[in-house]
């Protein structure tokens, strides 16, 4: 079924920054998609086009990207008369029209907005739910509900505290369903609020960009201690494990790492990658840490590789791999990590996101689908994670509507699947393993 109209506009994301929203019309109706945006971005990500006009939104406007859709991409697609069910053809056409390696002509935010809307329209055209359409595009007969990784303590570039490491997450792997995982996550979150309030006072329970708490602590193991206490208090020590996103590229300084990077610079406190690796090993030993994302800088390949060989937990590449096929292939070859963080806006199209996921999975990696810190009410990634059967998703704390939008959609999907619903649980790293 052909597209009848494509219209883009500038809307605001959860941080009050502009982003792109696309409305695509077919005979079946109107399909709307909005594009997310990250705070700690990898240098190898596809280009997010911003206007740079300091008199509007401090330079962060996206009118250029919107205009590229309304004046160029949209009309070209309508003229081409491609069907919305041909996701790959549509994406390929836009990528070739852009003609750059990193989508810098039109902006990944322009191409992705259209790509997401086309995917939603394609599902409607086939008369199937979005998650089923995505599963078909990926060649998956199965559907899997993911374990949610709730980011409940925020540090790094997401928070105004001194904590260097960006995210401390809880994963309710012992739950029997996604709905139960939500309940467990929410209960631990509320207990954590009480623990933080009791220890640091009420103002320490203010939340960061992703709904997690941002108490003013400096020591990273103090955050882990808070999680451990909250998990015990909620009564789930056997059901909840811990994940971290260190986002180490944010505090990499001249070949070393600064765990107090928000204070005035002092090179004498910088530590080597090897020393940082030892710190992670102590975390794994003393706490139920099962997953660490971006433990080292995006170009510190050597440290990634030596660290991976010495641990048996999940090591996730985000800034390292940026959902990019070339970077993933490089990481596979160097044995740098064993899990891909999948962010649709890092690569900028649905087709390439599916390809990245399949490349990672075919090499025995896990895949974790992820939001960005600047989000919208769009729930596309909830359907994406089910269709791609990755078994794990991180989309913030059980707090803030732009985060809950995704989690609530996952509960609806589980409900719709009824007794066919499969929850990844403890098999979150490889949910397809029989």
Swiss-Prot record:
One of its GO terms (biological process) is glycolytic process. CDD domains: enolase. This is Beta-enolase. Keywords: Acetylation, Cytoplasm, Glycolysis, Lyase, Magnesium, Metal-binding, Phosphoprotein. The active site is at 210 (proton donor), 343 (proton acceptor). The modification Phosphotyrosine is found at residue 236. HAMAP family: Enolase. Its cofactor is Mg(2+). The modification N-acetylalanine is found at residue 2. Coiled coil: none annotated. The modification Phosphothreonine is found at residues 72, 205, 229. It is found in: Cytoplasm. Mg(2+) binds at residues 245, 293, 318. Mammalian enolase is composed of 3 isozyme subunits, alpha, beta and gamma, which can form homodimers or heterodimers which are cell-type and development-specific. Interacts with PNKD. Glycolytic enzyme that catalyzes the conversion of 2-phosphoglycerate to phosphoenolpyruvate. Appears to have a function in striated muscle development and regeneration. Its EC number is 4.2.1.11. The modification Phosphoserine is found at residues 83, 157, 176, 263. GO terms for molecular function: magnesium ion binding; phosphopyruvate hydratase activity. It is an enzyme of class 4 (lyase). One of its GO terms (cellular component) is phosphopyruvate hydratase complex. Substrate binds at residues 158, 167, 293, 318, 370-373, 394. InterPro entries: Enolase, Enolase-like_C_sf, Enolase-like_N, Enolase_C, Enolase_CS, Enolase_N. Mg(2+) is required for catalysis and for stabilizing the dimer. The lineage of its organism: Eukaryota, Metazoa, Chordata, Craniata, Vertebrata.
């Amino acid at each position: 079924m052909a597209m009848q109209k494509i219209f883009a506009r500038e809307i605001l994301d959860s941080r009050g920054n502009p982003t792109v929203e696309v409305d695509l019309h077919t005979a079946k109706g109107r399909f709307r998609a909005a594009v997310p945006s990250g705070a700690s971005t990898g240098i190898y990500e596809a280009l997010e086009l911003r206007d740079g006009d300091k008199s509007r939104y401090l330079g962060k406007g996206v009118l250029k990207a919107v205009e590229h859709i309304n004046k160029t991409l949209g009309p070209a697609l309508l003229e081409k008369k491609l069907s919305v069910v041909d996701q790959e053809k549509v994406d390929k056409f836009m990528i070739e029209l852009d003609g750059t390696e990193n989508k810098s002509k039109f902006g990944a935010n322009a191409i992705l907005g259209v790509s997401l809307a086309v995917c939603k329209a394609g599902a409607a055209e086939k008369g199937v739910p979005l998650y089923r359409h995505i599963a078909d595009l990926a060649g998956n007969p199965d559907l899997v509900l993911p374990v949610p990784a709730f980011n409940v303590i925020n540090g790094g570039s997401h928070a105004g505290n001194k904590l260097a490491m960006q995210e401390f997450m809880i994963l309710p792997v012992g739950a029997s369903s996604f709905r139960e995982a939500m309940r467990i996550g929410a209960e631990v979150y509320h207990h954590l609020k009480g623990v933080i309030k009791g220890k640091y006072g009420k103002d320490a329970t203010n939340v960061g960009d992703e709904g997690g708490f941002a108490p003013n602590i400096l020591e990273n193991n103090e955050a882990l201690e808070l999680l451990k206490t909250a998990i015990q208090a909620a009564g789930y020590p056997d059901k909840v494990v811990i994940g971290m996103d260190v986002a180490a590229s944010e505090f990499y300084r001249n070949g070393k790492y600064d765990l107090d990077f928000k204070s005035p610079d002092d090179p004498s406190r910088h530590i080597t990658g090897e020393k940082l690796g030892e710190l992670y090993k102590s975390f794994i030993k003393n706490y139920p840490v099962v997953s660490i994302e971006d433990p080292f800088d995006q170009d510190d390949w050597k440290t990634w590789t030596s660290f991976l060989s010495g641990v048996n937990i999940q090591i996730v590449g985000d800034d390292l791999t940026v959902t990019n096929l070339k970077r993933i292939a490089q990481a596979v070859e160097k044995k740098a990590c064993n899990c891909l963080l999948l962010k649709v806006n890092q690569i900028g199209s649905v087709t390439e996101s599916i390809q990245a996921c399949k490349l990672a999975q075919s090499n025995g990696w896990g895949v974790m689908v992820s939001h960005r810190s600047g989000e919208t009410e769009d729930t596309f990634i909830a359907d994406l994670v089910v269709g791609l059967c990755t078994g794990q998703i991180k989309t913030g704390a059980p707090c803030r509507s732009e985060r809950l939008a995704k989690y609530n959609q996952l509960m609806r999907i589980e409900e719709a699947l009824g007794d066919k619903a499969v929850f990844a649980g403890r098999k979150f790293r490889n949910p397809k393993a029989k």
